[in-house]
Amino acid sequence: MKLGFITSILDGWTYEQMMDFASEQGFECVEVACWPEEKAERRYAGVSHIDAERVNQDDEYAAHIMAYAEKAGVEISALAYYPNVMTADKEKRNAAIEHLKNVIRASKKLGVGMVTTFIGRDQTKNVRENLELVKEIWPPIIKLAEVCDVKIAIENCPMLFGEEQWPGGQNLMTTPPIWREVFKILDSDNLGINYDPSHFIWQMIDYIRPLYEFKDKIFHVHYKDIKIYKD
């Protein structure tokens, strides 16, 4: 396992500045933010250190991205884009899906082979209805990932932290029972988990047991400290 960080915390930095910092601080890898150029709807979104669309269109730019990573001695562990591709807003949904596909193609072109994201959630629907929506929205995305030989790692964050994320949150894949259902629907070796145990702690879920049951599905890991104040 290699230690790195998600680059969305360095909003306003260039790709080169971010890579230089990672190298100087001794990080082995980075999960590189690849949001489209747009106004951020929430904290840590809207950050882009790699322009995925440009990667797919500009061979010289793509070569520079990889050459600079090699020069810095820092591996790109994944391309990161965490939208809600199952939002009830069809215009936003379609835009998010298209950009996610661009990120998948860019991951292939750069030789990264990993994209980290959310499964999404329609906040107007219950869990069962959202599972039906997974059947509608995700198969073409997974098919593209398979064709590109890119793994998709879904983070287990509920995305339930603000008024705009209520009710239900914006990410369906938040508990092991739902993981089982989604993996039945999307039976692919290219779909797995970006495992973040901190989200299980505040949901009062065992964060060790899933490591054994889903050991073959854990593609990437987020690790952060957390403390529950019960008062």
Would you name each region that the model predicts?
Residues 3-7, 28-32, 76-81, 115-117, ...:
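Hydrophobic faces of well-ordered beta-strands that scaffold small-molecule active sites
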